[in-house]
A protein has these predicted regions:
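Mid-domain Rossmann-like dinucleotide-binding core that forms the NAD(H)/NADP(H) cofactor-binding site
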Residues: 6, 11-98
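Residues in the short beta-alpha loop(s) of Rossmann-like NAD(P)-binding domains
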Residues: 73, 144, 171
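C-terminal hydrophobic helical "lid"/dimerization subdomain
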Residues: 102, 126-130, 173, 177-211
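Glycine-rich cofactor phosphate-binding loops and adjacent beta1-alpha1 units
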Residues: 34-39, 61, 78, 82-164
């Protein structure tokens, strides 16, 4: 119908690969665009779901020289290491202060140049701010629903460290288009279809929703 845009899926992208990228890859595309990752940056990604792992991939393709993924479960963190993460931090094993200290340790005491929040947990936001270096950039992409309020210290977490905070909301046609181009070129390297952990037939649709 009028106003609807359609992109033809290239023949060399298997349907499973496209579904694995889903809306997570275009969402991550928008986030990394906002993050403005540059060659040589250290990047932390909070969240190891489809958006977080896709953001990790795009950060590497944008030139990040150090990539740290914070999340759970270990299966997803293992995927992050296969993608090319330099280090992973399991939130089931370390508490918030320990996670911040670990990022500081891995970045030589500075903190990350850029942190991308893709966890969906409001508590991750002040934690991620403290993982980011002075005059660094913090991008929030995971807060797609109202999951509650957070407490932060605007003096120490934002003003004093001159932190730049950016948010992203939604995706447009261009993010889908560029995502398909990325998948066509790098799909055999990053294998988005690995993000699919189970498939359902149409008769199992209610079971899929319950799961």
């Amino acid at each position: 119908k009028p106003g609807v845009k359609v992109i033809k899926l290239p023949a060399d992208i298997p349907p499973e690969r496209f579904i694995g990228g889903g809306c997570g890859l275009p969402t991550a595309m928008h986030a990394v665009q906002q993050a403005q990752v540059q060659v040589g940056d250290s990047v932390v990604v909070q969240g190891s779901g489809p958006v977080g792992l896709s953001a990790a991939i795009l950060a590497l393709l944008s030139g990040a020289c150090q990539l740290i993924v914070v999340g759970a479960p270990q299966l997803r963190l293992d995927m992050a290491l296969e993608i090319g993460a330099d280090a992973v931090i399991n939130i089931d094993e370390l508490g918030p202060e320990e996670r911040i200290a670990r990022v500081r340790e891995l970045t030589g005491g500075r903190g990350a140049d850029i942190t991308i929040e893709a966890s969906g947990s409001p508590a991750a936001v002040p934690e991620g701010m403290r993982m980011t270096r002075d005059a660094g950039r913090y991008v929030v992409v995971g807060q797609y629903t109202d999951a509650g309020d957070i407490a932060l210290n605007p003096h120490w977490d934002v003003n004093r460290k001159h932190l730049e905070v950016r948010g992203t909301w939604g995706i447009d046609f261009g993010h889908f288009y560029r995502s398909i181009r990325v998948m066509a070129k790098y799909g055999d390297r990053f294998l988005w279809e690995r993000l699919i952990t189970r498939s359902y037939n149409l008769e199992q649709v209610n079971e899929a929703l319950d799961d």
